[in-house]
Amino acid sequence: MVRILGILSLALLAATLLGGCAKAPKMTNTGFLSTYDNLEKVSENRTKYMSGDFVAKYHKVIINRVQVLVHSEKPIMTAQERDDVINYFQAALERVMTNAGFEVVTEPGPDTARLRVAITDIQKSSFWGNLHPGSKLMGAGTGGASMEGEILDSVTGRQLGAVIQAKKGSQFDLEYFDGLDDVKDAINAWAKQASKTFESMRAKPESG
């Protein structure tokens, strides 16, 4: 018993020293966006741009398939995990846009926007950081993700909105271990933020 407690204590100490101040993945500039000139810094982990006329003039949206642009010497995910993350993000985007009042379509048009999103970095949760609940609460072993996304006029290609952001996962999900849980937590946080942005824009009175 003493030996087991000693091992757990060492694991917790290692978690504290190696990952106690877990940070979000780095934001990237991969060239995925059509332009980066419109972006303005919001925080250390977020830059964004949104055209004032987007909500008023566009009522439909084409949602391109989410891309994964993660470059690593060693594979970060299996093919199944990759598909799982893409499908999870795709479903989240469709919910956000539908709830915001946009009709999801497949053909370009004058009142139709195009949404493009890419995951540009992924940090899977590490098993050693989940050996003890205390280590997870301190951020050890916490994963996350970063992304780039933009909304374009589906006909002209004009950028209507864009964002680059990074997010680490939840430190409080202690029920079970899944290396992609924190990536999905990041996706959920981005979806929630996007929903708030659209709600705020629709709440503003139209000018003129």
Predicted regions and their residues:
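Second-shell loop/turn segments in exported
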Residues: 73-84, 103-104, 173-181
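C-terminal motif of bacterial Sec signal peptides marking the signal peptidase cleavage site
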Residues: 17-20
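Surface-exposed short loop/turn segments
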Residues: 95, 99-158, 169-176
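Extracytoplasmic/secreted envelope proteins and their assembly/folding machinery
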Residues: 86, 90, 94, 101, ...
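Compositionally biased, intrinsically disordered linkers/stalks adjacent to structured regions
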Residues: 167, 175-208
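A structural "domain/chain start" motif
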Residues: 22-87, 198-208
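Bacterial N-terminal signal peptides that target proteins for export
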Residues: 1-9
